[in-house]
Amino acid sequence: VNNVDGVTREALESKQREPLLHRIYGIADCWMISGVLAVSCITVSLNSNYIIVRDKERKISMDFVSSPILPRTISFSYLVFNCIVTFIINVLVFILSQIYLAAYGAYRISFLDFLAIIGIVLLSSLSASTLTYFICSFIQREAIRSPIVAIVSAGVGFLIGAYRPSNRGPKYIGEVTMFFPGTYSAGLFRNYFMSRPISLLTNLFSQAEYEVFKPLVGVLSNEFSLTLSFFGQVVSPLTRRGVIFAFVGIFLVLDIIFSSRNALNFLQSRKKKKKKEESSSKEGK
């Protein structure tokens, strides 16, 4: 944003283009908001898993396993709870961000883009829920979960490239980020948040009155890259959705497998404990 300011501020202020300046700042704001939403889907989901760890710590999960309820049903219940909480909170964040952008005349989203972003929030919430539930299924104590949440919350924005354009920094870092589902969510958010503002600004600069600012479009496009590249291959928005669905499917299967395995291990250990107690009582007699 500072580079953009250096190129445009003097010309904008000299021609009293305050509404235009707001639109340019709005593009930077859209970039940051899309990153915040991508990060928030992960951090909110990770924090929502406190109830899973709490149930394990208080031995409530053992009561569930001992009941006639199937282990996959228990896992599915936790996942649905996590996804609903994550989705609702991020929808509220999205609505507040749109109120902020509209309040100072930066950008008003179209109805179709609004529905598309709501869909991306739902897909990202589902992806984050399956991933974070898988991680937290191995955590038995809240004292372990809390520092993990703190570390992930601090670094996940850079890990998925939410706060850094893909064309900035070492190339290998950009390639590593492509192995995380949050990277594709951030890319989808950027496309729907920023494509229309940049398009409107391009059309505006094509007018003779604003022709002096036409080079700014190239600067903005370079500063806020909307493309994702996986080892030199450009990843289209449709492919990004497919990758997120693939991650959801993989971690959903892993969640079911490991929840069933954990339940089986618990029941076996309980039977062994019961047999040991019975043998001890017989010896006592």
Per-segment meaning from a language model:
Residues 1-28, 260-266, 282-285:
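Hydrophobic alpha-helical transmembrane segments
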Residues 28-51:
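Long, hydrophobic alpha-helical segments
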Residues 36, 55, 78-79, 117-121, ...:
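Residue-level recognition of transmembrane alpha-helices
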Residues 45-69:
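Transmembrane helix boundary and interhelical loop/hinge segments in multi-pass membrane proteins
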Residues 60-61, 74-84:
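Short hydrophobic alpha-helical segments within the ABC transporter permease transmembrane module
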Residues 62-66, 140, 178, 191:
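Short amphipathic alpha-helical coupling elements at transmembrane boundaries
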Residues 71, 81-163, 241, 249-256:
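Alpha-helical transmembrane segments and their short interhelical loops
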Residues 191-270:
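Alpha-helical transmembrane segments of multi-pass membrane transporters/translocases
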